[in-house]
C-alpha cells in the first residue's frame, strides 16, 4: 500500500433513483487514512438544478432537500463535477461509499459524462481504486458475523440499511439521508468491521481490484468459490457457493458462474435456447409454470464483487444461512461430468439482450468509450470561455459529443445559443418535461394523501409543486 494511501468516503443525495436520467442534489465526502481516521476537511456541495428536469417528489420526501434549496446553495453542474473530480483524482485514493458501486459511482459517471470528464479514469489512474462498504458488510454477516450487532427487518431477515446498522451498533447517525451524516456513518461502520474482523477486511480490501479477483477464478477446474451479493437474497444471507464455468463471450470483465444450490439437472438437460428464455423471465412467472430458476449469474470482476475460496464459508455459518454444503458438492460433481456445459452457458450469453434504444444522448454513456483524441478535445472544451463554445474549432470522432455539447451550452450558457438553437432547445425541453409531467403530478397527489397529517412533508410537497408548476408553465 502506498504511503500516501487514503480513502475518500462519499455519498450523493439525488432527485431520483436512476443515475442515467436523474440529477444529483447534494454531494458529501471526507478523506480518511487507511484506518478510517479523518485527515481532510469535509466537502459538502449542492448542485444547481436545470430547467429541463422535474425532480421525483418521492426523493424529496426521503432527503428533505428541495430543488429551491439546491438552486439557492448550489453551484452549476460543471463546477460541481470539477470539484468532485479534484477530490477523487488525488493519487492513491480509494473512493468508497455505501452501495456506491451500483448507485453513487453511476451517478458520478453520468455527471462526469455530461460535463466532458472521463467517467472512469478517477477510479484507476494514479494508483486509484474504488470499493463498496455495503458488500463488505454483507460478507461480514455471512462469513464472519462475530463482533457486530446485526439488524433485522419485521420478517426476521437481516437488514443492511445503514441507519438500522448504526442504531444497532450505537453509532450516532442523526439525519439519515443527509449526505454528510451518511458519510460519517459509513466511516464508523468501516472502522468497526476493520476492528472486529481485521482478516476479513484485509482479504476483501486486497481483492477489490479485478487483477486480484481474477487470480481466484479457475474455470477449467470449476473451483468453487463463496460469493456474496445483494442479488442473491437476504433469506440466505446473500451468500452462495458458486462454480465458475466460463468467461463471458463478449464482456471480458464478466465470468459466468453457477449457483451450486440451484437446479443443476435442469441446467444440464435443457437446451441453451430454453434456458436463455427462462433466465430472462420473472421468477414469479416461472413459479406459476412450475419451472425452477436458471442457476446462472454473471459476476463482474470490475465491480468489486465479493468472491473468496469456498472454505471461507465455515460449516457453522453454512448451517446458519441454510446452505447445504453436501448438496452443493454433489451438484459440482454433476457439472464437472457434463461435457457440454461450458459451450451451453457461452451460447446462452452469446446473444445480447435487446434493450429499447435511447433517444437521449445523456443516457448513452455505455454506448462506447471515447478515443484519446476526443478525451483531449473534451478537456479543452471544459476550459473554454462560454463565448468560445459555439465556435470551438475542434473535431470529434464520437457522434455523441456535439449533442452533449449542445445540451451543455443550453443548460449552463444559454446566451451562447443562436436563435435556431434556442428554438431547438425549447422544443427538446418542453417535450422532456411533458413526458415526465403526468408521473410528477400523480406522485404529488399520492404523497399528499399519504402525508395528509404531516405538516413538514406537506410543506416540502408544496415547494416541489411550486417548482414543477413554474417549469411547466
What is each model feature region?
Residues 13-20:
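Short acidic, Gly/Ser-rich segments with clustered Asp/Glu that frequently serve as metal-coordination loops
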Residues 63-80, 87:
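Metal-dependent phosphoesterase signature
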Residues 421-473:
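C-terminal non-catalytic accessory extensions
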Residues 195, 206-286:
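Acidic catalytic cores of enzymes that act on phosphate-bearing nucleotides/polynucleotides
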Residues 1-6:
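N-terminal accessory regions of nucleic-acid-interacting proteins
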Residues 249-425:
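Long, charge-rich C-terminal accessory regions
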Residues 22-25, 31-32, 37-63, 88-198, ...:
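Metal-dependent phosphoesterase core characteristic of DEDDh/y 3'-5' exonuclease domains
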Residues 9-11, 259:
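Short hydrophobic beta-strand that contains or immediately precedes a catalytic carboxylate
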Amino acid at each position: 500500500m502506498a504511503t500516501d494511501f487514503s480513502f475518500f468516503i462519499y455519498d450523493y443525495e439525488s432527485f431520483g433513483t436512476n443515475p442515467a436520467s436523474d440529477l444529483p442534489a447534494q454531494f458529501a465526502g471526507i478523506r480518511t487514512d487507511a484506518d478510517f481516521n479523518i485527515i481532510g476537511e469535509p466537502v459538502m456541495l449542492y448542485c444547481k438544478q436545470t430547467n429541463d428536469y422535474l425532480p421525483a417528489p418521492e426523493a424529496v420526501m426521503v432527503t428533505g432537500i428541495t430543488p429551491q434549496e439546491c438552486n439557492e446553495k448550489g453551484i452549476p453542474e460543471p463546477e460541481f463535477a470539477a470539484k468532485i473530480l479534484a477530490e477523487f483524482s488525488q493519487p492513491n485514493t480509494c473512493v468508497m461509499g455505501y452501495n456506491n458501486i451500483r448507485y453513487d459511482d453511476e451517478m458520478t459517471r453520468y455527471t462526469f459524462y455530461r460535463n466532458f470528464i472521463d467517467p472512469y479514469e478517477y477510479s484507476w489512474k494514479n494508483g486509484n481504486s474504488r470499493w463498496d462498504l455495503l458488500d463488505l458488510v454483507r460478507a461480514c454477516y455471512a462469513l464472519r458475523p462475530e463482533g457486530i450487532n446485526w439488524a433485522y427487518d419485521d420478517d426476521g431477515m437481516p437488514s443492511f440499511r445503514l441507519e438500522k446498522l448504526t442504531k444497532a451498533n450505537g453509532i450516532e447517525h442523526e439525519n439519515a439521508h443527509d449526505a454528510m451524516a451518511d458519510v460519517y456513518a459509513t466511516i464508523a461502520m468501516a472502522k468497526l468491521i476493520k476492528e472486529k474482523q481485521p482478516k476479513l477486511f484485509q482479504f476483501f480490501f486486497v481483492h477489490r481490484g479485478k487483477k486480484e479477483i481474477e487470480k481466484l477464478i479457475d474455470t477449467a477446474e470449476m473451483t468453487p468459490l463463496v460469493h456474496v451479493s445483494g442479488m442473491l437474497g437476504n433469506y440466505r444471507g446473500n451468500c452462495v457457493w458458486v462454480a465458475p464455468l466460463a468467461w463471458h463471450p463478449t464482456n471480458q470483465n464478466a465470468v459466468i458462474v453457477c449457483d451450486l444450490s440451484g437446479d443443476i439437472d435442469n441446467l444440464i438437460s435443457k437446451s441453451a435456447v430454453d434456458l436463455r428464455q427462462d433466465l430472462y423471465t420473472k421468477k414469479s412467472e416461472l413459479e406459476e409454470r412450475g419451472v425452477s430458476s436458471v442457476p446462472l449469474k454473471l459476476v463482474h470482476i470490475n465491480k468489486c464483487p465479493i468472491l473468496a475460496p469456498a472454505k471461507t464459508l465455515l460449516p457453522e455459518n453454512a448451517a446458519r444461512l441454510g446452505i447445504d454444503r453436501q448438496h452443493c458438492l454433489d451438484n459440482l460433481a454433476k457439472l464437472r461430468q457434463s461435457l457440454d456445459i461450458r459451450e451451453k452457458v457461452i451460447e446462452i450469453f452469446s446473444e445480447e439482450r435487446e434493450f429499447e434504444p435511447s433517444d437521449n444522448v445523456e443516457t448513452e454513456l455505455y454506448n462506447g468509450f471515447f478515443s484519446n483524441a476526443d478525451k483531449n478535445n473534451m478537456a479543452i472544451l471544459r476550459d473554454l470561455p462560454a463565448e468560445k463554445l459555439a465556435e470551438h474549432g475542434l473535431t470529434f470522432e464520437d457522434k455523441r459529443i456535439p449533442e452533449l455539447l449542445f445540451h451543455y451550452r443550453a443548460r449552463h450558457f444559454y446566451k451562447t445559443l443562436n436563435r435556431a438553437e434556442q428554438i431547438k432547445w425549447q422544443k427538446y425541453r418542453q417535450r422532456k418535461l411533458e413526458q415526465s409531467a403526468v408521473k410528477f403530478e400523480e406522485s404529488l397527489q399520492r404523497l399528499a394523501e399519504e402525508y395528509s397529517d404531516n405538516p413538514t412533508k406537506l410543506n416540502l410537497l408544496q415547494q416541489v409543486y411550486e417548482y414543477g408548476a413554474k417549469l411547466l408553465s
